[in-house]
Amino acid sequence: MLRGLIVAALAAAGLASAAPQAPVIGHSVQGRAIVAYERGDRSAPPTLVVGVIHGSEPAGLALIMQLRRMPLPPHVHLWLVPTANPDGLAAGKRQNAHGVDLNRNWPAGCSHTGDSGPRPLSEPESKALRGFILRIKPKLTIWYHQPLAEVYGSDPHVAVLKRYARLSGLPYRKLTAPRGAATRWQRRQFPGSPAFVVEFPAGPISTANARRNAKAVLALSVP
C-alpha cells in the first residue's frame, strides 16, 4: 500500500517527467538525482521547503506540487526540494540505501550509533543538502515529515512556528530536535533563520490540506 501511495505521490508531483529538467543539487547512494525547483523573486531572501527526507513519509510531495503551481505573492522566493532521499522514497523506506537515517546524519550532536551513520555527513544526500543550504542561505526552512500531525520546534523563533500552526490547523508542540537532525544543524549555522519540522498525519493528505499548508508556507515567506 505504501509503495502505491508513493508512486501516486510522485506522479502527482510531476517528478517522473519533470525531474530531468530541474536543477540537480546532488545524487543519492544509488545515483538518483536530488533536484531543487526555484520559483519567484530571485532578489528576495529564499524560503527552502523539503518535502521528504524519510522515504516512508511521502505526504510532503503533495505540498510541493501545490507550491510549484500556486500563484506566488510579490517578493516571495522559493526553493523546493521534493525529496532529499530519493532511494528511500523509491523503496518506501525511512533510511537511505545505506540504511542511514538522513535526519540523524548532520553535524549537530550526531551520535554515530544506530542508523545515524558512521560519521556526520557520511551520506551523499545529507552532504548535498548541506552544501545547497550553505549556498542559498535560506531565511526560512521547513522540513516535512509524518505521521505526528503537529508543528514542532524549540528555537527562539517560536512565534513563527505558532503562526504556521495556526494557519495550517496543526497543533504546535515545543520539542527539541534530535541529535544529528537537519534543523538542529541549521539553527546553529543560521541562528537568525527559522528552521522547523511540520508533521503531516499518516497516509495521503487531501488536496485541500496540502493547499492550506502551501498557503501557510507562502504567508511566512512574504517579507
What is each residue range found by the language model?
Residues 27-29, 44-53, 57-68, 72-177, ...:
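Active-site/substrate-binding loop(s) of hydrolase catalytic cores
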Residues 33-34, 89-92, 182-188:
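Short, solvent-exposed polar/charged micro-motifs at secondary-structure junctions
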Residues 35-44:
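Short beta-strand-to-loop junctions in surface cap/lid or active-site-entrance loops
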Residues 153, 179-223:
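Active-site-adjacent mobile loop/cap segments within catalytic or ligand-binding domains
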Residues 2-35:
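Short glycine- and acidic-rich boundary segments immediately preceding or forming the N-terminal edge
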